[in-house]
Structure formats: C-alpha cells, structure tokens
C-alpha cells in the first residue's frame, strides 16, 4: 500500500505532468499551424517545436516513472523494468536539454549585441553552429546510453545481492568502475549546462546594458522598448534558474541512486528535477510575442465561452 508520502508525491507528479503537457502541446500546435499557414518554418519555431515534442515524450516517461516509484518501486529490480525506464528517461532528458541549449544559444546570437569580432563571426555562422551542436548531441547520446546501460547493469547486479556492504567490500574494483561511469555521465551532462549558462548570462548582460542605454536616452524609462527588455530579462533569469535547478537535481539524483537506489528522498529530488520540463514551456510562451498573443486570445475566448454557457440567473 502506498504511504502518505507516496500519495503526495504522485499528486505533485501528476500536477507537474498536466502543467507541462498543456504548455508544450500549445507550443507545438501553434508553431505547426503557423508553419502550415505560412508554408515556411523559421529556425526558432523549428527548435521550439522539436523541444516541445521532446518534452512531451519526457513528461510521459516521467509520469510512468513516478507511478513506478510511488506504487511499485520493487519492479526496478525484480523485473528489470527500471533499466528500460531509466534509459528512456535519459534519452528524452538528453534531447530536451540539448534542444534547450540550442534555443538558448540561438536567442543569444539573435538578441544580444556585442561589438567583439568573435561574437560577430559566430553570429554569422550561427545556423551551422546549431547544426554542429545537434550532431554533437547525437554522438553524446549514443555514448551516454552505452555508459548508462553499463552503469545500470552493474548497479542492478549489486542490488540483487543480499548484503550490499559485504558485496562492496568484496568487489572494490566494481565499485571503482561505478564511480568512473558516474563521473563520465556527470561530465557529459555538464557540456550543455555550461553552454546554456554562458549564453544566457551573456544575453542577460547584453539586455541590462541595452536597457541602461534606453533609460539614458530621451525616450525615458517608460518607453515600450525598455519594458520589453525588462520582460526579456525576467524571462532569461527564470529560464536560467530552472536550468540550474534541473542540472543540480540531476547530479543529486545520480548520487542518491549510486549510494542507495531506494532512498525515500529520491522522490523530492525527482520533483525538483522534473520542474524544468514541466514549467519551462510557460516561460517560453511569455517570452515569445506570437505565443503570448495567441495564449491571450485563447484565454479570452475561453472566458467568453464560459460566460455565455453559464449566464447569470435573473
């Protein structure tokens, strides 16, 4: 029977799933309809759509994993179902993280303004750089999947033993291999994190500098461009905050699983880890004028529909 902690965990996991699903389905539908209507797909819309599709897949895996952890955690080792779930989660998380990284870099070169020659040279070759990053992410996905498969096989073999401490004492070499594999997984996940962190921080600095210049101009602080830049800064910092929480939660989750796979605190780490795929879509909607305007129109239609379908009694 699930405990009270398990029930709370499942409720929060379902809420995260619904929030993330609504936001990403909305992004996918709007961009697909716009692409069909205009017979043209822009680079930002393409990356956004791919990110939404990848996140939807990740959310489905997360929901299944949450039910598995909350209701039948023993299946992770009894039927080796956990191996498949972990691999699927890792693949979808890898794609989502790298697509978010590509989007961060794309916005950085599109919005930021730096007079440095290296920045101008990279901006000129931005499309080729995005393609190169996607190719690199696919190679790293294959490498990570092989490393993770070996890591899971060794971990599950250790868990199958009746005495974990005794098994570690007798198999120090195997424990060292696990440490090496865990380090490799952490290093490969650090690559997209460092790229996103760098691009978002430089984008934020560029927006701050541009906003300061607008304040000093004759337009005044109430200029619409200034307000737009302030809103963009808030969106960038919110996205960056979620990305940082996601990265460090991933490292903590890997460490907890490495030390004790059935630790009760893993549930809380999973909730923090899943906040990024659940909430980042709404940050993207608020930061994108087309998506934001479409969302406002949709909410207005829904509000009018509820008023007409439920008229006030006389």
UniProtKB/Swiss-Prot annotation:
Residues 29-50, 123-127, 209-238, 287-314 are cytoplasmic. Keywords: G-protein coupled receptor, Glycoprotein, Membrane, Receptor, Sensory transduction, Taste, Transducer, Transmembrane, Transmembrane helix. Pfam families: TAS2R (PF05296). PROSITE patterns: G_PROTEIN_RECEP_F1_2. Residues 1-7, 72-101, 149-187, 260-265 are extracellular. It is a multi-pass membrane protein. The chain crosses the membrane at residues 8-28, 51-71, 102-122, 128-148, 188-208, 239-259, 266-286. One of its GO terms (cellular component) is plasma membrane. It is found in: Membrane. GO terms for molecular function: bitter taste receptor activity; G protein-coupled receptor activity. The keyword Phosphoprotein does not apply. Glycans are attached at residue 163. Belongs to the G-protein coupled receptor T2R family. Most taste cells may be activated by a limited number of bitter compounds; individual taste cells can discriminate among bitter stimuli. Receptor that may play a role in the perception of bitterness and is gustducin-linked. May play a role in sensing the chemical composition of the gastrointestinal content. The activity of this receptor may stimulate alpha gustducin, mediate PLC-beta-2 activation and lead to the gating of TRPM5. This is Taste receptor type 2 member 42. The lineage of its organism: Eukaryota, Metazoa, Chordata, Craniata, Vertebrata. The gene is TAS2R42.
